[in-house]
């Protein structure tokens, strides 16, 4: 798996990820003649993933396991997760895990051209996932209110440390911070010793699992109402 490369003029550069989990994401059913067939429950659902590191990408990975088409938008140089922790053959094991079952396109959201291509993608999407600091998508004119007129059925999943509003909304929201603030680390470890961080980023992974569940429920409800939703998930 090669690191993402810059793509001139905002053109799409799609690369399928390795390690697809075809059997994991399949539901086995019996056909009319008794033959076994497989169907993925999220087949036909297009997800645009905006976000980096763990919570957003893990949400996209879960939806991809179950058949969704996940298009990951990465900045020039790629998601930092590609080089996070231990790296093998130019790519981290973390990215090999959370980048599978996805397509990837490099777009610079700090440029108008990059935002324009992203906006066109969001108009065709069923779901968008983002885990930027609250207000960032609105600054780029890519927030829910900006996209809704052209795509009223869009399900917009937002993951942040402390929520989209409130006194802490603009504070850095990494799981390592919110786990400590919530007291989770205090209850781990040994008596009379400092708090201990678990060997997995639970703030990110639990938020992502709840985000994937929320997206799935919103898809079910959209079949009844034809309306999209905005979901707010937090680490704390």
Region roles according to the model:
Residues 22-226, 234:
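N-terminal helix-loop segment corresponding to the beta1-alpha1 unit
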Residues 6, 11, 15-20, 25-26:
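Low-acidity, Ser/Thr- and Arg-rich intrinsically disordered low-complexity segments
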Residues 5, 232-235:
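Residue-level detector of conserved catalytic or cofactor/ligand-binding positions
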């Amino acid at each position: 798996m090669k690191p993402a490369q810059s793509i001139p003029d905002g053109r799409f550069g799609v690369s399928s990820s390795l390690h697809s989990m075809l059997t994991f994401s399949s539901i086995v059913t019996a056909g009319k003649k008794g033959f076994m067939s497989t169907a993925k429950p999220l087949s036909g659902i297009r997800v645009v993933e905006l976000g980096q590191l763990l919570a957003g990408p893990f949400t996209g990975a879960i939806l991809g396991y179950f058949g969704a088409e996940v298009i990951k938008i990465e900045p020039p140089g790629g998601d930092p997760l590609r080089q996070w922790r231990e790296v093998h053959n130019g790519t981290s094991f973390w990215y090999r895990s959370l980048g599978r079952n996805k397509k990837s396109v490099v777009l610079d959201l700090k440029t108008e051209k990059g935002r324009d291509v992203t906006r066109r993608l969001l108009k065709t999407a069923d779901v968008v996932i983002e885990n930027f600091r609250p207000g960032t998508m609105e600054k780029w004119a890519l927030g829910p209110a900006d996209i809704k007129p052209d795509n009223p059925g869009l399900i917009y999943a937002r993951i942040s440390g402390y929520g989209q509003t409130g006194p802490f909304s603009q504070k850095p929201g990494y799981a390592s911070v919110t786990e400590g603030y919530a007291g989770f680390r205090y209850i781990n470890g040994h008596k009379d010793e400092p708090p201990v961080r678990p060997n997995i980023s639970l703030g990110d992974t639990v938020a992502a699992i709840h985000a994937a569940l929320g997206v799935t429920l919103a898809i079910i409800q959209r079949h009844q109402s034809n309306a999209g939703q905005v979901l707010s998930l937090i680490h704390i």
